[in-house]
Regions:
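RecA-like P-loop NTPase motor core of helicase/translocase proteins
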Residues: 1-227
Length: 227
């Protein structure tokens, strides 16, 4: 199977998304949205600098294939990147498994929409596999991480692994450009606190108080992922 030919309403939706991304890149999300949608932009999602919009698609209208086409579109028009990081969120584990299989299957229409843009160097993985992608591959190949929304809900104590300090990310963070981690300050659970160190039976965190965690969430945040 190759890339599906998009229906007219699907292409229209992507064209609108591309127009917004291009305008947001030069004018900012709020002004771009106001000009294109004719109503005020809602800043509640990610603030004034990071664009957040919804596409209205009918039930059964091919939202997944649109998402696959939206990744290279937004990477090009908003980020100007040919090796983006995208976090693909779904509402349940069953849908996560289904989506992951499709995006990893050669020839599947969803994967084809991505490989048409990025070739077979495309990396599609789960949260558990992020640390296995070699540090030099970030920024050189497109990376799509498929996860459930619940994995990032910080109030869910059972789902906080993405924010936990993990030594498996040591080579990633130690190789990060100097000063690049300043952007992590102020993000939820991004920095090791004195309380964290006191609760750490291993003693590892004592030397990291006030510094960004070596965590999955922080590593993704460093790469300004499409969401």
């Amino acid at each position: 199977m190759t890339s599906l030919t998009l229906k007219t309403y699907q292409q229209t939706a992507l064209d609108a998304l591309g127009a917004f991304a291009r305008a947001a890149r030069t004018k900012g999300p709020a002004l771009a949205f106001g000009e294109l949608a004719g109503r005020p932009y809602n800043l509640d999602a990610f603030g004034a600098q990071v664009p957040c919009v919804c596409l209205r698609i009918p039930t059964g209208g091919g939202k997944t294939v649109l998402a696959a086409h939206a990744v290279p579109l937004l990477a090009r028009e908003w980020q100007g990147s040919d090796a983006p990081v995208a976090v693909w969120l779904v509402p349940s584990d069953a849908i996560r498994q289904q989506t992951l299989k499709a995006l990893q299957t050669p020839g599947h229409a969803y994967r084809a929409a991505l490989t048409d843009a990025y070739g077979e160097g495309l990396q599609v993985c789960t949260l558990d596999d992020v640390a296995q992608i070699a540090p030099p591959d970030w920024g050189r190949h497109a990376v799509v991480v498929v996860a459930t929304i619940q994995s990032f809900r910080i109030e869910d104590a059972g789902q906080r692994n993405v924010y936990s300090f993990s030594e498996s990310f040591e080579p990633h963070f130690k190789g990060a450009p100097e000063g690049s981690m300043a952007c992590l300050q102020g993000l939820p659970d991004a920095v090791v606190t004195a309380h964290d160190a006191a609760q750490d039976a291993t003693g590892v965190l004592a030397g990291f108080v006030g510094q960004p965690r070596w965590s999955l969430a922080n590593w993704l945040a460093l790469h300004n992922p499409l969401l």
